[in-house]
Amino acid sequence: MEYSHKSVLLKETIEYLNIKPEGIYVDGTLGGGGHSEEILKRLTTGKLIAIDRDLDAIKASKERLKNYKNVEYINDNFKNIKEILKSLNIDKVDGILLDLGVSSYQLEEVKRGFSYMKDAPMDMRMDKNSPFSAYDVVNKYSQQELERVIREYGEEKWASRIAKFIVKEREKGEIKTTFQLVEIIKNAIPASARREGPHPAKRTFQAIRIEVNEELKGLDKAIEDMVEVLRGKGRIAIITFHSLEDRIVKNTFKKLENPCTCPPNMPCTCGKKPVVKIITKKPVLPSKEEIETNSRSRSAKLRVAEKL
């Protein structure tokens, strides 16, 4: 399959990474390969480690990047960065990039079930080898569990009604497709609320996808691990697409920049030293032009930190 993946905040991310031609870089979310390609264009004797837990993404990007020989493809989760680098006998790297959330090629591949705009089986797995899918969440979670997931990960104010309607509907039979779920969500949200804001199913689909792929679980620890494997002056650039992810990135960077746990008015005795300097005091947002040509970029935020 040919992926028409448009990389978000591409120019800004590459500029902030300060790429050295001889450096070692990690793209922890290879996706359609757009960011990786721009990194590779700037390398001479350097190397890129391209990681994705979606094997389809790796296959597609291998084709796109076939002219480059200095790439190591790894089918794994970026959260395992330490183990991945150890297996490659790499101690430190010069820069790391993460483009979080679902990628446009995953949305475009209808049968994966990520999109609420196309009918497909209830799947949403980024790793197709995982035994746990959106079908399990929708058909097996209790009403209470569903409400928690939709409220917590979707920040959906109608979470209680949506969970109730899902449970009621599945009494008639299994919920097998995305359009079945979209219809249930539409029925659960009052008509007046449906008329404004984004697609009524957007938040619930986001919530289920995050639950299925454990997207937020251990993200803070993964960022800390990545900073640990960075060389001094090396940078980590992270693109997020919703407030939950962005909050984790922002708070983790802050903690690494100011790890001191002493009371504010007292001299520091805890001995915890800053590990990074935050380069982007405010997140970098896409330009109006980018939003016009790539609607996926609308909610994107880029944050960058530099290892001290």
Swiss-Prot record:
Report the domain of life of the source organism.
Bacteria
Q: Is rRNA processing given among the entry's keywords?
A: yes
Its UniProt entry gives the catalysed reaction(s) as:
cytidine(1402) in 16S rRNA + S-adenosyl-L-methionine = N(4)-methylcytidine(1402) in 16S rRNA + S-adenosyl-L-homocysteine + H(+)
Name its GO BP terms in alphabetical order.
Answer: rRNA base methylation
Transmembrane regions listed in the UniProt entry: none
Q: What class of enzyme is it?
A: transferase
Matches recorded under InterPro entries: RsmH, SAM-dep_MeTrfase_MraW_recog, SAM-dependent_MTases_sf
* GO MF entry, a single one: rRNA (cytosine-N4-)-methyltransferase activity
Coiled-coil stretches: none
EC nos: 2.1.1.199
Under the heading SUPFAM superfamilies, the entry gives: Putative methyltransferase TM0872, insert domain (SSF81799), S-adenosyl-L-methionine-dependent methyltransferases (SSF53335)
Q: Which UniProt keywords apply?
A: Cytoplasm, Methyltransferase, rRNA processing, S-adenosyl-L-methionine, Transferase
Give the residue ranges for region: Disordered: 289-308
Described by its record, this protein's role is as follows: Specifically methylates the N4 position of cytidine in position 1402 (C1402) of 16S rRNA.
Protein name per Swiss-Prot or TrEMBL: Ribosomal RNA small subunit methyltransferase H
Organism equals: Thermoanaerobacter sp. (strain X514)
The gene name on file is rsmH
